[in-house]
């Protein structure tokens, strides 16, 4: 290796890296701020303009876009015609390229960033050099990540060159990196234009964790996250204690967070297998947790609990009495943290809460991807329609709205029985609505008397209303829209139940 081109925005570790290259007899070519950093550190360096014999122009937009650079990168060393061509133009081969790109992601995440600032942080020369070097990885080593500096130096010291396998791996890394960089720019500009579903979608995610296994032990898995911070998201969670999250932990935590984010009042949500098993609302977080626990004392064991307020010592004392996989909250008091961390394996996570989840959901199918707006429609309760002779009381209406927030997060067909303070019975994922209703009512038992019932979709028959009435339900909330709505309304009137239609369906598959 004789010649290296180095141009980086992230200068961490670059000076000692270059110093070692010089010790190994490598000539350093550099640009702008990187060149200045080398000169200040006393590292021998050749300016890019000395190689191209052309000055930087357009405020630095054009520096390395020159045949003297790309010819030196792309020339195949095993092809005589290539080597003769660059020699004829006095172009020297470049054997190592170290480049990281303008911080576009960091720029667009700044508060108040302008379009002009974003545009100026779109790197052109950097990706071009990286791609040229990566294409010719048979002869050229290309580095885009500071973590690879040591590998390159070790191989140079031991062999005088990098191995083919290392060059190939680094080239693949470069193409992933530039593809992700371009995808981020495309997404940013697409959002500005207001296009919702463009003809092509390129998604970029960063690997956060290689998981022990997936949903089952025979399935390999990893966790990838979107660039930047996403509020109300497990991807932005900070783990304070406990062992690593599993695949199932992450999915359950995501489900719990979505429900907890629906409420502004203190709420505790217990989840098992992506369905809530108990949700409690209270004047304070202790009361909320106790209501969630009482909702289903059996299923909460080994579950995940999400709370939308700081966990205090009293709440922590209650939670420490049972086995919980994960507790998620905006924060933990010092006393609560001390109590909970006595359990070695419990995972404690903090997540920033900021209202219900918005944006888009992505679901893979075999050979494709479904994208839809999140089910975060803002519903105006004033538009809800009471269709029965009996009007819901103020207390019943409060309970109906609370359970309506919950039922949208239960796998369809979904029925939730509850009060204004807690769920009492949850029927999830049955192939017919009456099946889910019977499960929820059976779970609620005697507590169903005086409770309310929420259904994520309309009643195809009046059987659910009749079953609810016989169990003691006093009010029902559902979207309506069935051709047999009149029969369900008539059944409600027969038993003196109030029924509210929201005209919004909340299927969850």
UniProtKB/Swiss-Prot annotation:
Gene3D superfamilies, sorted: 3.40.140.20, Methylglyoxal synthase-like domain
Biological processes, Gene Ontology terms: 'de novo' IMP biosynthetic process
CDD domains recorded: IMPCH
Pathway field: Purine metabolism; IMP biosynthesis via de novo pathway; 5-formamido-1-(5-phospho-D-ribosyl)imidazole-4-carboxamide from 5-amino-1-(5-phospho-D-ribosyl)imidazole-4-carboxamide (10-formyl THF route): step 1/1; Purine metabolism; IMP biosynthesis via de novo pathway; IMP from 5-formamido-1-(5-phospho-D-ribosyl)imidazole-4-carboxamide: step 1/1
Stored SUPFAM superfamilies: Cytidine deaminase-like, Methylglyoxal synthase-like
Domain of life from the UniProt record: Bacteria
Reaction(s) this enzyme catalyzes, per UniProt: (6R)-10-formyltetrahydrofolate + 5-amino-1-(5-phospho-beta-D-ribosyl)imidazole-4-carboxamide = 5-formamido-1-(5-phospho-D-ribosyl)imidazole-4-carboxamide + (6S)-5,6,7,8-tetrahydrofolate; IMP + H2O = 5-formamido-1-(5-phospho-D-ribosyl)imidazole-4-carboxamide
Family statement: Belongs to the PurH family.
Domain remark in the UniProt entry: The IMP cyclohydrolase activity resides in the N-terminal region.
Protein name (database record): Bifunctional purine biosynthesis protein PurH
